[in-house]
């Protein structure tokens, strides 16, 4: 699973140290749970990205149907391959290509909120993400985990609403582009072929 890249900042180190210096019992029993507003943001990230995936798949499948891609199992491709094809099949203007690349980068946030447990830091506007997955641990660190090691990430609170706003804009653009491309394809099929 693709996760956001690790970025060492002073703030991130401070937040991670708060976690490391707190007993797991206290983290799991005393740290604040997500608020209703937090949960709504998480749901929006997951839902918006689901619609981004739907539109990316519609594009790639339409290109396969139009013979821009070889016939095959396009419908079975993992999302990362679909994102790659969406970026490379057409000669996109630079700003459109950047939008597609940004969607792929932001999928890592969707993965984070969808696959990690989330808590709030007690005295900071920040989120703690916790997972226990050996495969993801190895992918992130290159090593096997020690007994009871957890994969964690931290995120400042204001970042998540900003991601939602950015994803909403990207989705609106992608939905419009997808509709235009599918309409062009339908219009081209409606033109009678010469005898």
Name each model feature, range by range.
Residues 92:
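Acidic/His metal-coordination segments adjacent to aromatic residues that form catalytic metal sites
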Residues 192-195:
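Short intrinsically disordered terminal tails
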Residues 2-84, 95-108, 112-123, 159-189:
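Amphipathic alpha-helical interface elements
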